[in-house]
């Protein structure tokens, strides 16, 4: 008697990089150039990581002093505003620790001083996962993602992860200061046009938007025609379609 074969369903190719295969993390370090960069790139994923029990720490490299429209506003005032906004935004996502390195906004370059300071943060917080900017200019996406500060932070962070943070012979003064070498397991780079690892943020998209709205100096400017809620939902919905979710963020996932 002939038997009917049961077809084995294959998971769609777009889902093969889904977060169902991501390990649990105890400590996560998010290294970004400016206040509001973490939320735009990975706010939903970081809220999810925090909900799952990870201790997520932000490292904001610049002072955010170029993120304003009024040339008469004092730098010190804008810096203070942006730091308050960043702390408030982080709290919405369940993130309690925010470190500010204080580099001048718009003046970053990938150099040894920046690498050393990021290595110090990695050795201090000992993350298993680091999230940071893409270290290369992307020509098929809006230019905002390829801000020169983003490129500098992305490249410096990648170099800090490997080889510097694990190498006892790199930045030896850090050893004397008590910062022992540390090995990072993974790096995630937000990459919304060409990401191949999708994190389902359907349950955290509202948290992401609430966090972004704390950056009032950036998303609620008088006369602005930009609807951040509409823009973010569309972008993360489009990414979600690729990953098989209602809303998603996409990353390049690198095993160190």
What are these regions (language model features)?
Residues 2-128, 252:
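Active-site rim/loop-helix segments in enzyme catalytic domains that contact anionic ligands
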Residues 2-29, 112-256:
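Metal-dependent de-N-acetylase/amidase catalytic core
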């Amino acid at each position: 008697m002939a038997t009917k074969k049961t077809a084995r369903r294959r998971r769609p190719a777009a889902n093969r990089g889904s977060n169902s295969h991501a390990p649990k993390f105890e400590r996560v370090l998010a290294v970004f150039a400016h206040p509001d960069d973490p939320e735009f790139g990975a706010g939903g994923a970081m809220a999810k990581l925090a909900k799952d029990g990870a201790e997520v720490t932000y490292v904001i490299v610049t002072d955010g002093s170029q993120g304003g429209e009024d040339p008469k506003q004092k730098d010190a005032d804008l810096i203070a505003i942006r730091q308050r906004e960043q702390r408030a935004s982080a709290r919405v996502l369940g993130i309690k620790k925010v470190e500010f390195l204080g580099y001048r906004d718009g003046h970053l370059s990938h150099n040894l001083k920046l690498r050393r300071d990021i290595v110090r943060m990695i050795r201090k917080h000992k993350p298993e996962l680091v999230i940071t900017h893409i270290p290369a200019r992307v020509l098929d996406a809006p230019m905002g993602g390829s801000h020169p500060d983003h490129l500098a932070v992305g490249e410096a962070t990648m170099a800090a992860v490997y080889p510097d943070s694990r190498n006892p012979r790199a930045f030896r003064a850090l050893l004397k200061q008590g910062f022992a070498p540390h090995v990072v397991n993974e790096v995630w780079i937000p990459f919304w046009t060409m990401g191949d690892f999708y994190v389902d943020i359907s349950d955290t998209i509202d948290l992401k938007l609430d966090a972004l709205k704390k950056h009032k100096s950036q998303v609620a400017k008088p006369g602005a025609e930009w609807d951040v809620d509409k823009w973010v939902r569309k972008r993360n919905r489009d990414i979600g379609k690729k990953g098989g979710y209602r809303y998603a963020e996409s990353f390049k996932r690198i095993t160190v």
